[in-house]
Swiss-Prot record:
GO terms for biological process: brassinosteroid mediated signaling pathway; positive regulation of brassinosteroid mediated signaling pathway. It catalyses: L-seryl-[protein] + ATP = O-phospho-L-seryl-[protein] + ADP + H(+); L-threonyl-[protein] + ATP = O-phospho-L-threonyl-[protein] + ADP + H(+). Phosphorylated at Ser-213 and Ser-215 by BRI1. Phosphorylation at Ser-215 is required for its function in the regulation of brassinosteroid signaling. Phosphorylation by BRI1 disrupts the interaction between its TPR and kinase domains, thereby increasing the binding between its kinase domain and BSL1. It is a lipid-anchor. TPR repeats lie at residues 423-456. It comes from the Eukaryota. A lipid is attached at G2 (N-myristoyl glycine). The modification Phosphoserine is found at S213, S215. This is Probable serine/threonine-protein kinase BSK3.
Length: 494
């Protein structure tokens, strides 16, 4: 009866409570298997200003972490120089009081490079600010795909792939001297552009002084951690066992309850009903047996990561099918710009038609500024403010007359005073720079407009035009798609 676990598993589980299993190691190292030929830039230290700009001023719209703004440490999505997508974790100010310890830990984790990890690209340590920068994974978490799916449940071959890749990630980290992973759970497993599962690098870093390695419900923490408050490599294996249960059941079942179900041979409660007919008794038996070994009360009786990999590898199915097909998700943002219904401005920017862009910006005026360029408090009415307004008016007139060099000068005067903030001014100066073949300055202005207004489609479209001028077509298409997504969301009232 496929999709149900046979009663024979009870015998396996009972035996595993008393006997460890010795597995011969394979000849290949974890690095050769999972880290080879994976090229990324070297770890670097970023300035706070770089990351502020990359995340549009740490905009709420860019938060991707589970609990949003309420989380003690918030994760944002962003783009470095409008090119590489990144995830930025901003720590609570009290999380890392010792800047030297933070830098040492970050640099150590930043040496890891594997296609099984969402790798750490860099960090920032300025004043009280502590931030980590990692590869951005666009296709959600394992928790989302297992517990909160919408269209369809994750297929059995994909579930097997997830746990194998996760075991390989842990094996690679262990081979590099980073065997400890803090609070391993379904939210730590992310999916990349190709929908391949990756282990978040953030769990590899922990401030030893804060005394907490598990933020989840205590029902899921290893028993030895409850006794000693310390995490060991065997504790990570225990957490891996809870993930095996998640994958098998499609639910977040407390380990003690799961072990009771196994002892009582109540396997129907342990397996996801959505998997009916997708796997054999033998496959289910092996996964439950492996989970029960990982959840052994005695840490020394749990398997090591290499034996996990060797146990899971033979179970793999549909090896030639890409993960994005198993998940029924378009590959790497596979939606082409050509297939999108583009607004006139998006169309003009996608063709880098600067004349058409100018006409649209001139016609739109300052409608998108929501009054930021016009609402002045009483105390602002000074001679300096009058000069500022005059520079704006002169800039607008030059922009209208297509005297783009003068427009740049006048808008720059307005921006330098800094008493008013206008995304439209940056948009107009951006186009003026493009008209003068200054694409890098144009890109900077488009990004600054996004800092002021993080969901403004015009800023994304102008960013695309600047990227096209720099010969960065793929990045330009991503910017167009981002702008279209925000424009669609705005028009639908979300």
């Amino acid at each position: 009866m496929g999709g149900r676990v046979s009663k024979a598993v009870a015998c396996c589980c009972c035996r595993s409570q008393h006997h460890g299993v010795v597995v011969e190691s394979s000849e290949k190292t974890a690095e050769e298997d999972h880290g080879e030929s994976y090229e990324l830039p070297a770890f670097q230290e970023f300035s706070f200003e770089q990351l502020r700009l990359a995340t549009s001023g740490f905009a709420v719209e860019n938060i991707v972490s589970e609990h949003g703004e309420k989380a003690p440490n918030v994760v944002y999505k962003g783009k470095l120089d409008a090119q590489r997508r990144i995830a930025v974790k901003r720590f609570n100010r009290s999380a890392w009081p010792d800047p030297r310890q933070f830098l040492e830990e970050a640099k150590s984790v930043g040496q890891l490079r594997s296609k099984r990890l969402a790798n750490l690209l860099g960090c920032c340590c300025e004043g009280d600010e502590r931030l980590l920068v990692a590869e951005y994974m666009p296709n959600d978490t394992l928790a989302k795909h297992l517990f909160h799916w919408e269209a369809q449940a994750m297929k059995w071959p994909m579930r097997l792939r997830v746990v194998l890749y996760l075991a390989e990630a842990l094996e690679y980290c262990t081979s590099k001297g980073r065997a400890l992973y803090h609070d391993l759970n379904a939210y730590r497993v992310l999916f990349d552009d190709d929908c391949n599962p990756r282990l978040s690098c953030f769990g590899l870093m922990k401030n030893s002084r804060d005394g907490k390695s598990y933020s989840t419900n205590l029902a899921f923490t290893p028993p030895e951690y409850m006794r000693t408050g310390r995490i060991t490599p065997e504790s990570v294996i225990y957490s891996f066992g809870t993930l095996l249960l998640d994958v098998l059941s499609g639910k977040h079942i407390p380990p003690s309850h799961a072990l009771d179900l196994i002892r009582d041979r109540n396997f129907n409660m342990l397996t996801d009903s959505c998997l009916e007919g997708q796997f054999s008794n033998e496959e289910g038996t092996e996964l439950v047996r492996l989970a029960s070994r990982c959840l052994h009360y005695e840490p020394r009786e749990r398997p090591n990561v290499r034996s996990l990999v060797q146990a899971l590898a033979p179970l793999q199915k549909d090896l030639e099918t890409p993960s994005y097909e198993l998940m029924d998700i378009p590959r790497g943002g596979a939606t082409s710009v050509q297939s999108l219904l583009l607004s006139p401005l998006a169309e003009a920017c996608s063709r880098k038609d600067l004349t058409a862009i100018h006409e649209i910006l001139e016609k739109t005026g300052y409608k998108d500024d929501e009054g930021t360029a016009n609402e002045l408090s009483f105390q602002m009415w000074t001679n300096q403010m009058q000069d500022t307004l005059n520079s704006k008016k002169k800039g607008d007139n030059a922009f209208r007359q297509k005297d783009f060099s003068s427009a740049i000068d006048c808008y720059s005067q307005f921006i330098e005073v800094g008493t008013m903030v206008s995304p439209t001014i940056y948009a107009r100066r951006c186009l003026s720079y493009l008209m003068n073949d200054k694409a890098e300055q144009a890109l900077s202005d488009a990004m600054q407009a996004l800092v002021i207004s993080p969901t403004w489609p015009t800023a994304f479209y102008l960013q695309a035009a600047a990227l096209l001028s720099l010969g960065m077509e793929n990045e330009a298409q991503e910017a167009i798609k981002d702008g279209c997504a925000h424009e669609t969301s705005s028009s639908s009232g979300h």
